[in-house]
Protein backbone atom coordinates (compact mmCIF):
# COMPACT_ATOMS: atom_id res chain seq x y z
CA UNK A 1 0.00 0.00 0.00
CA UNK A 2 1.30 3.46 -0.87
CA UNK A 3 2.21 5.92 1.85
CA UNK A 4 0.43 9.23 2.20
CA UNK A 5 1.94 12.61 1.44
CA UNK A 6 2.33 15.31 4.08
CA UNK A 7 4.03 18.25 2.37
CA UNK A 8 3.63 21.98 2.91
CA UNK A 9 5.18 24.73 0.78
CA UNK A 10 4.97 28.32 2.01
CA UNK A 11 6.34 31.65 0.83
CA UNK A 12 5.77 34.46 3.28
CA UNK A 13 7.19 37.03 5.65
CA UNK A 14 8.29 36.55 9.24
CA UNK A 15 6.07 38.26 11.77
CA UNK A 16 8.66 38.05 14.54
CA UNK A 17 12.37 37.53 15.08
CA UNK A 18 13.25 33.84 15.37
CA UNK A 19 13.13 32.27 18.83
CA UNK A 20 16.00 29.77 19.10
CA UNK A 21 16.45 27.39 22.00
CA UNK A 22 18.76 24.43 22.43
CA UNK A 23 18.07 20.96 23.81
CA UNK A 24 20.33 19.47 26.47
CA UNK A 25 22.03 17.57 23.64
CA UNK A 26 22.80 20.87 21.88
CA UNK A 27 20.27 20.64 19.04
CA UNK A 28 18.80 23.98 17.93
CA UNK A 29 15.02 24.43 17.82
CA UNK A 30 13.94 27.68 16.15
CA UNK A 31 10.34 28.88 15.98
CA UNK A 32 8.93 31.65 13.80
CA UNK A 33 5.52 32.97 12.77
CA UNK A 34 5.18 33.15 8.98
CA UNK A 35 2.48 35.23 7.30
CA UNK A 36 1.10 34.31 3.89
CA UNK A 37 -1.33 36.60 2.11
CA UNK A 38 -3.72 35.56 -0.65
CA UNK A 39 -5.99 37.68 -2.82
CA UNK A 40 -9.45 36.89 -4.10
CA UNK A 41 -12.38 38.84 -5.49
CA UNK A 42 -15.61 39.16 -3.55
CA UNK A 43 -19.10 39.14 -5.11
CA UNK A 44 -18.82 42.81 -6.05
CA UNK A 45 -15.48 42.24 -7.81
CA UNK A 46 -13.39 43.96 -5.14
CA UNK A 47 -10.03 42.45 -4.22
CA UNK A 48 -10.00 40.95 -0.74
CA UNK A 49 -6.77 40.12 1.09
CA UNK A 50 -6.58 37.28 3.57
CA UNK A 51 -3.52 36.76 5.74
CA UNK A 52 -2.87 33.40 7.38
CA UNK A 53 -0.31 32.94 10.16
CA UNK A 54 1.68 29.72 10.31
CA UNK A 55 3.84 28.42 13.15
CA UNK A 56 7.07 27.10 11.63
CA UNK A 57 9.68 25.06 13.52
CA UNK A 58 13.25 24.42 12.33
CA UNK A 59 15.42 21.72 13.95
CA UNK A 60 19.18 21.12 14.09
CA UNK A 61 21.50 22.86 11.66
CA UNK A 62 18.56 24.36 9.79
CA UNK A 63 17.36 25.78 13.11
CA UNK A 64 20.76 27.36 13.72
CA UNK A 65 20.78 28.93 10.24
CA UNK A 66 17.21 30.21 10.57
CA UNK A 67 17.95 31.71 13.98
CA UNK A 68 21.09 33.43 12.74
CA UNK A 69 19.96 34.82 9.38
CA UNK A 70 16.20 35.34 9.50
CA UNK A 71 14.69 38.51 10.97
CA UNK A 72 11.22 39.97 11.39
CA UNK A 73 9.95 40.96 7.94
CA UNK A 74 12.28 38.57 6.07
CA UNK A 75 10.72 36.83 3.12
CA UNK A 76 11.36 33.10 3.11
CA UNK A 77 10.42 29.94 1.19
CA UNK A 78 9.78 26.96 3.47
CA UNK A 79 9.09 23.30 2.73
CA UNK A 80 8.04 20.95 5.47
CA UNK A 81 5.25 18.86 6.89
CA UNK A 82 2.23 19.47 9.09
CA UNK A 83 2.50 18.32 12.67
CA UNK A 84 -0.42 18.25 15.10
CA UNK A 85 0.43 18.23 18.80
CA UNK A 86 -1.72 17.74 21.87
CA UNK A 87 -0.47 18.76 25.29
CA UNK A 88 -1.68 19.79 28.71
CA UNK A 89 -1.17 23.46 29.53
CA UNK A 90 -0.05 24.84 32.88
CA UNK A 91 -3.72 25.44 33.67
CA UNK A 92 -4.43 21.70 33.29
CA UNK A 93 -6.45 22.15 30.08
CA UNK A 94 -5.70 20.01 27.02
CA UNK A 95 -4.46 22.16 24.16
CA UNK A 96 -3.82 21.51 20.50
CA UNK A 97 -1.31 23.09 18.15
CA UNK A 98 -0.49 22.86 14.48
CA UNK A 99 3.09 23.45 13.34
CA UNK A 100 4.95 23.27 10.07
CA UNK A 101 8.13 21.25 10.70
CA UNK A 102 10.52 22.67 8.10
CA UNK A 103 13.05 20.54 6.28
CA UNK A 104 13.99 23.04 3.53
CA UNK A 105 14.38 26.81 3.60
CA UNK A 106 15.29 29.46 1.01
CA UNK A 107 15.84 33.06 2.06
CA UNK A 108 14.24 35.44 -0.44
CA UNK A 109 14.34 39.19 -1.02
CA UNK A 110 17.24 41.60 -1.14
CA UNK A 111 19.82 42.40 1.50
CA UNK A 112 17.71 45.22 2.91
CA UNK A 113 14.89 42.74 3.54
CA UNK A 114 17.07 40.35 5.49
CA UNK A 115 17.07 37.86 2.63
CA UNK A 116 19.53 36.92 -0.05
CA UNK A 117 21.84 33.99 0.13
CA UNK A 118 21.44 30.47 -1.06
CA UNK A 119 19.09 27.66 -0.28
CA UNK A 120 19.32 25.90 3.02
CA UNK A 121 18.40 22.25 3.06
CA UNK A 122 17.79 20.56 6.33
CA UNK A 123 18.40 16.89 6.71
CA UNK A 124 15.19 15.20 7.62
CA UNK A 125 15.11 14.62 11.35
CA UNK A 126 15.30 10.94 12.18
CA UNK A 127 13.41 8.94 14.77
CA UNK A 128 15.39 8.09 17.85
CA UNK A 129 14.90 5.65 20.69
CA UNK A 130 14.30 8.49 23.14
CA UNK A 131 11.19 8.57 25.33
CA UNK A 132 8.15 8.88 23.13
CA UNK A 133 5.59 11.66 23.24
CA UNK A 134 1.99 11.30 22.15
CA UNK A 135 1.26 13.37 19.05
CA UNK A 136 -2.47 13.85 18.71
CA UNK A 137 -4.43 14.12 15.52
CA UNK A 138 -6.40 17.34 15.39
CA UNK A 139 -10.11 16.82 15.35
CA UNK A 140 -10.77 13.22 14.57
CA UNK A 141 -7.67 11.41 13.43
CA UNK A 142 -6.06 9.37 16.15
CA UNK A 143 -2.59 10.07 17.43
CA UNK A 144 0.75 8.66 16.46
CA UNK A 145 3.81 8.12 18.62
CA UNK A 146 6.79 10.16 17.53
CA UNK A 147 10.09 10.37 19.30
CA UNK A 148 11.70 13.76 19.61
CA UNK A 149 13.58 14.27 16.41
CA UNK A 150 17.32 14.50 16.05
CA UNK A 151 19.25 16.03 13.17
CA UNK A 152 21.72 13.98 11.14
CA UNK A 153 25.07 15.65 10.48
CA UNK A 154 24.72 17.83 7.41
CA UNK A 155 27.26 18.08 4.64
CA UNK A 156 28.58 21.61 4.47
CA UNK A 157 27.83 23.55 1.30
CA UNK A 158 30.00 26.59 0.95
CA UNK A 159 28.51 29.55 -0.88
CA UNK A 160 30.69 32.17 -2.55
CA UNK A 161 31.10 35.39 -0.56
CA UNK A 162 28.46 37.98 -1.38
CA UNK A 163 30.46 41.05 -0.29
CA UNK A 164 31.29 42.32 -3.80
CA UNK A 165 27.94 41.43 -5.37
CA UNK A 166 25.58 44.15 -6.58
CA UNK A 167 22.05 43.86 -7.96
CA UNK A 168 23.30 45.52 -11.17
CA UNK A 169 25.45 42.44 -11.83
CA UNK A 170 22.36 40.34 -12.57
CA UNK A 171 21.87 40.06 -16.36
CA UNK A 172 18.06 40.10 -16.22
Swiss-Prot record:
GO terms for biological process: DNA recombination; DNA repair; DNA replication. CDD domains: SSB_OBF. Residues 107-172 are annotated as: Disordered. Pfam families: SSB. GO terms for cellular component: nucleoid. The keyword Transcription regulation does not apply. Residues 149-161 have a biased composition (Low complexity). Residues 5-109 form the SSB domain. Keywords: DNA damage, DNA recombination, DNA repair, DNA replication, DNA-binding. Residues 109-122, 135-144 have a biased composition (Gly residues). GO terms for molecular function: enzyme activator activity; single-stranded DNA binding. A motif (Important for interaction with partner proteins) lies at residues 167-172. Plays an important role in DNA replication, recombination and repair. Binds to ssDNA and to an array of partner proteins to recruit them to their sites of action during DNA metabolism. Homotetramer. This is Single-stranded DNA-binding protein. It comes from Xanthomonas campestris pv. campestris (strain ATCC 33913 / DSM 3586 / NCPPB 528 / LMG 568 / P 25).
Amino acid sequence: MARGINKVILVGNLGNDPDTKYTQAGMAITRVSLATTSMRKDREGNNQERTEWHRVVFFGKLGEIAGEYLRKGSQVYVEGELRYDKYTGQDGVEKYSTDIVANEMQMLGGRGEGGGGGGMGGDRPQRTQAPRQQQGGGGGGGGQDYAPRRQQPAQQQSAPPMDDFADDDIPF
